[in-house]
Amino acid sequence: MSIKAEEISALIKQQLEKYDDKLNVNEVGTVTYVGDGIARAHGLNNVLSSELLQFSNGSYGIAQNLEANDVGIIILGRFDDIREGDQVKRTGRIMEVPVGDQLIGRVVNPLGQPVDGLGEIKTDKTRPIESKAPGVMDRQSVNQPLQTGIKAIDALVPIGRGQRELIIGDRKTGKTALALDTIINQKGQDVICIYVAIGQKESTVKNSVETLKRFGAMDYTIVVEAGPSEPAPMLYIAPYAGTAMGEEFMYNGKDVLIVFDDLSKQAVAYREISLLLRRPPGREAYPGDVFYLHSRLLERSAKLNKKLGGGSMTALPFIQTQAGDISAYIPTNVISITDGQIFLEADLFFAGTRPAINAGESVSRVGGSAQIKAMKKVAGTLRVDLASYRELESFAQFGSDLDQATQAKLNRGRRTVEVLKQPLHKPLPVEDEVLILYALTHGFLDAIPVPDIQRYELELYDYFASNYNDLLDVIRTTGDLPEEDKLNEALKNFNEGFSISKK
């Protein structure tokens, strides 16, 4: 059998056409040190800051320190099976997390992996954990309220959609309870909620998730959990991962509420990473860029303009203080970044005033823009009244004779404090809040003894729901007060039928 020369040349041509001269070039380095959640690698000369790197065992890390001879890497997840001499290669991208509707109702870790035992999350959408905050022209002013269902907040320090409101206070002063109540109150409000638990005990997070399930709030909530047993890098990236998940909804025109519980633990984790990477320590041993750590996170929460879909992301960052000291380094940093703060005071909490909001130290820089008209009318003088009551109270305890006007102010103040108290996990619809505050500010509670106030409040809601639902509907639908004559008449009728407790 003879082989023809044409066949050979045709075969060679065919093979040459198939030849692909593209080479897959991976820049690979060598691990020179590993321990405490960080690694150092030599040979990654072109690596970029915050680039995702892959170790030979499949683990990932983020390039954090770019030095002359080596690269400081924070390891995401387990590091006990990474050894000196192992290979680490560049991926050419920054870290991304899965995003989308499929995450709603799930508990995930900062890498977006499920930790609730309900199977894998099937989503093909991802977003980078670090992204540029919307610019000045991409935003619009905050003008729509985010109702928390907590009278003291909605009346004194209102929160708007797209605002960043700091919740600050000592441990065990009700910070988490405040956030959970706010999430529970978003039911039916078309708001997606994200709860980021940073360094919280596993048992605490489990209780929080159970509470949200009990009230049906997990139907619109994502929980991102980085437990205290996780390496410091996981606690550090958790808030950024949660924000990336929220941005997916915000840029699709939806309203998002994100809670960071709490950023003090993230700052401590970042301090640990920085010290291990031999970065120079500054005040309280924090690195010099700890302000930027929080500012670049919180600036991503915004109310977008109509051109970008008009979505919003409202952030409630938590900071834990030591003995009520809000002038420490991290608290002052976050106060200066946010649009106001709600200060929870331990003394008020243990005195039975819950939520333990210190009205004098708390402020909302958005203010009345984030309130419906009815709430603006009834809560206008509440803060001033409360402040003057606190001032008068300190004089009154000396037992000196008080004139009638001062006594009236003290009586109104005591009733104000009582009205602003609220039981755990009982957020109120805005029309009920307006109703009780209207009754308070228009003197309908002045003759009611302080111990009867809470019973009065509950009976008032039931009475109006049964007999004057049309008046509540006006507040609910228009956001304004109904005709004052009708409202006064209804309150007068209720007061006549209310029985005061016998002493």
Swiss-Prot record:
It is an enzyme of class 7 (translocase). ATP binds at residues 169-176. GO terms for cellular component: plasma membrane; proton-transporting ATP synthase complex. It is found in: Cell membrane. GO terms for molecular function: ADP binding; ATP binding; proton-transporting ATP synthase activity, rotational mechanism. It is a peripheral membrane protein. Keywords: ATP synthesis, ATP-binding, Cell membrane, CF(1), Hydrogen ion transport, Ion transport, Membrane, Nucleotide-binding, Translocase, Transport. It comes from the Bacteria. It catalyses: ATP + H2O + 4 H(+)(in) = ADP + phosphate + 5 H(+)(out). Its EC number is 7.1.2.2. The record marks 362 as: Required for activity. Belongs to the ATPase alpha/beta chains family. Produces ATP from ADP in the presence of a proton gradient across the membrane. The alpha chain is a regulatory subunit. F-type ATPases have 2 components, CF(1) - the catalytic core - and CF(0) - the membrane proton channel. CF(1) has five subunits: alpha(3), beta(3), gamma(1), delta(1), epsilon(1). CF(0) has three main subunits: a(1), b(2) and c(9-12). The alpha and beta chains form an alternating ring which encloses part of the gamma chain. CF(1) is attached to CF(0) by a central stalk formed by the gamma and epsilon chains, while a peripheral stalk is formed by the delta and b chains. This is ATP synthase subunit alpha.
